[in-house]
């Protein structure tokens, strides 16, 4: 079995790690960075840029540069969280034919899993470049509070990228693995506070260490899948826009280019204010009107930023209380607090967490890398390379069915350790009822329609009887991958119906296969483009060296030989302007052939120069004696 890589597919940044022997290693991407911006750009000439290259051009291509796509994955267009983003994102969010939230780029509809797949492809390539072998399997992390649809959409993204997703695990759980694997920590209960670019999670995790065998059991989890650093950025952006409007009378919200520059500046200022008390937002030529160009130059203090976002930080406090209650623990039971996600570097966040738990969070866990490391550890467990580790995760939301009166009746409560199985007896609501519809739901609301519908099926052939007499046994069975199997059995007749809930990501099997084919075609196109660039570079180097040799030694060649070389250089230069790798290679060989005499002449001259240096009579052998200064 090959390596199973660990990927933290983040809202703002993504990270990849592997297990080497007994150690984990975070891999650097092609730009030399340990994290990759989760940004994908579609350029005018059809190229797809991922990471820093996409981020660098975002100011000039805002409508075709996609970021924070994780906030849309697995969501419906009419969802309140999506509608909040529709008005503030520079790119176009649309409703797909099935009602899901999709993107529109240059008139083409794109599903969020397709965009995430581009990021995963870069992660996959990073691993393959380092390992020198093909990588086909991965463990990918998701927020603990992601529902089944969001998890399935993430798995689909992996599949489109050419990865078999061996396991989807929760980000706080992965961080706990990274924290606890190589530490002699004994038994303890920890809290993982994960505030990333777009999502927030809190997980209470118990680590049992018995004779070196560690069990990581999630006791409770809670969170908000639409709260993170992007929201902090938006608060600062809105403040800057309002201040500029007061000063200049111009609303920058109508200028996509200005807003993209402002987004970058706000993110930079937010990061700087984690270390400094004050920073400047200086954006010359941010816009212009009839009176001329306008510049933005504003001072932002840490106190001002904190006043803008304090309510967002406070929103993370209630889930902490709920998680502790669900775990039947008090604050004093928590031995360590782990901070995960870049937004936890903000001093205000650290202070609020410290005040809540009455203890300082640990500083020995890298908030940007811990999740990817934990995913790699889980990959090592699945491949058999990591021993003595058992991970017991939970289902984040309750699972149940719709019963009489439109009520959701839960069969499996939230925070139940998986895998798990639970059965319950139900009956008919009317006399002589011959069939029942089993409507499977996920969520915490009492009213069925307020929860997430996962699917439904019918059990018919029930023998006529007074209502309440038939016994219908409904069984929910969740496996280790979080896939739900539901069955309904009439205990009187023995008739049974089953359904496997592989939560739909909104993409049909045919759509996924089509996207996989497109991704494979793009991979071939990318490979050809890379080969073309390498051939062009080879041609450039050859022309440069040949011109240099011709300038130095061309007067020692016959005129016809010089003409042949110059003509070959000109032909190669013309071929470089085209897109044919074969044409460039043919002209490279032609230039090498006609310049063979020049090359031989150059080598002879270089050899003669080297010989002269060796026999230079002015070089004197001498012995030196070290002379020490007299003190």
UniProtKB/Swiss-Prot annotation:
InterPro entries referenced in this protein's UniProt entry, alphabetically: ATPase_NBD, Chaperone_DnaK, Heat_shock_70_CS, HSP70_C_sf, HSP70_peptide-bd_sf, Hsp_70_fam
Pfam families referenced in this protein's UniProt entry, alphabetically: HSP70
Superkingdom of this protein's organism: Bacteria
Induction conditions: By stress conditions e.g. heat shock.
Keyword Chaperone: yes
GO molecular function terms noted in the UniProt entry: ATP binding; ATP-dependent protein folding chaperone; unfolded protein binding
Keywords for the protein's UniProt record, in alphabetical order: ATP-binding, Chaperone, Nucleotide-binding, Phosphoprotein, Stress response
Residues with the Phosphothreonine modification: 199
Signal peptide residues on this chain, from the entry's feature table: none
Family: Belongs to the heat shock protein 70 family.
Function: Acts as a chaperone.
Name by which UniProt lists this protein: Chaperone protein DnaK
